[in-house]
């Protein structure tokens, strides 16, 4: 087998994401004509510590959201450095781009430019070898199929309603396999739609395919989901669990140091906010809370971890932004017990893999995630299996840009056959009871 395969072309273009906003797509061509292609996602609620997504800010084009500059950076700066190099040397390719950029936050070339190239290189290498992307990234040990963390109800900045918490999700940890888990989720999703219809509530879907009905409170959203789980014939707390993503940085007032639950007309101190979650956890089968406290409220995070870290999964998204520096601060301070992994928060495959490795060494789980602005690219489905992460967050079983990831996981499950493993509740090795 050849160990050096030359990159002969790196080319980027502007395409549209699932919200109709421009994003970057990159193609990497190899000496034998093999092409690897990758498209980059984009978030709505973004952490302030995320790597920079370069946009043109020219109001006369796509409301200022075009990415021509990022595309130009690939075609004129990055391509020049990578053409002639070995596609199999992922670490070196990513390192060259990081050095070319030279900033802490990918502000010069843009994380969207760099990630497109990084992923297209990996895909080209896998294509050349004639193997699946998860096998190329993860090797022979890549075999764990993830428990879906499926967003079926929205509030916060993903919706226009009275619900403050951003995402209400189901996790079919009691399923026998990934395909069984997906079926359970789809059945619950359709049942939920019918329940909302019967109540005369909206069944329009948000950016990630979840419903955004105008409910009275956060608790009502949980109750309606539990009703859907039971009506679909499943047992809450045994087969299906609830996960929340409050995205609390969005409703944290840094001046008053309070969490403003506007839908409920309440302002809570960090300690009261932790108490609020503790009561929900006691009352409902909640297994995971993501970004329960704001990205800069380290004291609040500490309180929440001390109170709930032994009972449920506490995921840092805005807190950690897929960044080893931020994650090591969290590990040191004993804050959270899980990290959300979003490729575009950091900007290269190598750095993403380093973050996942650091999390797992510290006993934290890694939940591989989509963004609210997605494309038909299915890299995250391969990534979650490649690193045996055991959990994926990629939206409702609706909207093709979400379903594409689930369908890719069905193919991977089929390919792995008896080798594949669906861990269910064992995926939560971070909950130290």
Curated annotation (Swiss-Prot):
Pathway(s): Carbohydrate degradation; glycolysis; pyruvate from D-glyceraldehyde 3-phosphate: step 4/5
PROSITE patterns: ENOLASE (PS00164)
Keywords for this protein: Cytoplasm, Glycolysis, Lyase, Magnesium, Metal-binding, Secreted
Primary site of residence: cytoplasm
GO molecular function list: magnesium ion binding; phosphopyruvate hydratase activity
GO terms, biological process: glycolytic process
SMART domains linked to this entry: Enolase_C, Enolase_N
Role description: Catalyzes the reversible conversion of 2-phosphoglycerate (2-PG) into phosphoenolpyruvate (PEP). It is essential for the degradation of carbohydrates via glycolysis.
Protein's name in the database: Enolase
Organism whose genome encodes this protein: Clostridium novyi (strain NT)
């Amino acid at each position: 087998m050849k160990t050096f395969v030359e990159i002969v072309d790196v080319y980027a273009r502007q395409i549209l994401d699932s919200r109709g906003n421009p994003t970057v797509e990159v193609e990497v061509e190899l000496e034998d004509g093999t092409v690897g292609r990758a498209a980059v996602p984009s978030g709505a609620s973004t952490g302030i510590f995320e790597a920079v997504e370069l946009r043109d800010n020219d109001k006369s084009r796509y409301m200022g959201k075009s990415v021509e500059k990022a595309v130009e950076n690939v075609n004129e700066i990055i391509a020049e450095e990578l053409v002639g190099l070995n596609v199999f040397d992922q670490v070196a390719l990513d390192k060259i781009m990081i050095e070319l950029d030279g900033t802490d936050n990918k502000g010069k070339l843009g994380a969207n430019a760099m990630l497109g190239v990084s992923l297209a290189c990996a895909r080209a290498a896998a294509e050349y070898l004639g193997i699946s992307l998860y096998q190329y990234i993860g090797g022979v040990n890549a075999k764990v199929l993830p428990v879906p963390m499926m967003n079926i109800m929205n509030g916060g900045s993903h919706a226009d309603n009275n619900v403050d918490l951003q995402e209400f999700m189901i996790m079919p940890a009691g399923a026998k396999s990934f395909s069984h888990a997906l079926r359970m989720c789809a059945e619950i999703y359709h049942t939920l739609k019918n329940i909302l219809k019967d109540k005369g509530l909206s069944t329009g879907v948000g950016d990630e395919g979840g419903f955004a009905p105008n409910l009275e409170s956060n608790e009502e959203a949980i109750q309606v989901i539990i009703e859907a789980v039971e009506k679909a014939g499943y047992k809450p707390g045994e087969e299906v669990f609830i996960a929340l993503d409050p995205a609390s940085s969005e409703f944290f007032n840094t001046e008053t140091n309070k969490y403003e639950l506007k839908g409920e007309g309440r302002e809570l101190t960090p300690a009261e906010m932790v108490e609020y979650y503790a009561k929900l956890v006691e009352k409902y089968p909640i297994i995971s809370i993501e970004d329960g406290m704001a990205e800069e409220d380290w004291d609040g995070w500490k309180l929440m971890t001390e109170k709930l870290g032994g009972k449920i999964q506490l995921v840092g998204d805005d807190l950690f932004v897929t960044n080893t520096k931020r994650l090591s601060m969290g590990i040191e301070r004993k804050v959270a017990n899980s990290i959300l992994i979003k490729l575009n928060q950091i900007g290269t495959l190598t750095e993403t893999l380093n973050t996942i490795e650091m999390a797992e060494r510290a006993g934290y789980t890694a939940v591989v995630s989509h963004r609210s602005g997605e494309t038909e690219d299915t890299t995250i489905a391969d990534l979650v299996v490649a690193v045996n992460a055991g959990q994926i967050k990629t939206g409702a079983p609706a909207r093709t840009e979400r379903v594409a990831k689930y369908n890719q996981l069905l193919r991977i499950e089929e390919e792995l056959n008896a080798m594949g493993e669906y861990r269910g509740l064992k995926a939560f090795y971070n909950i130290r009871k």
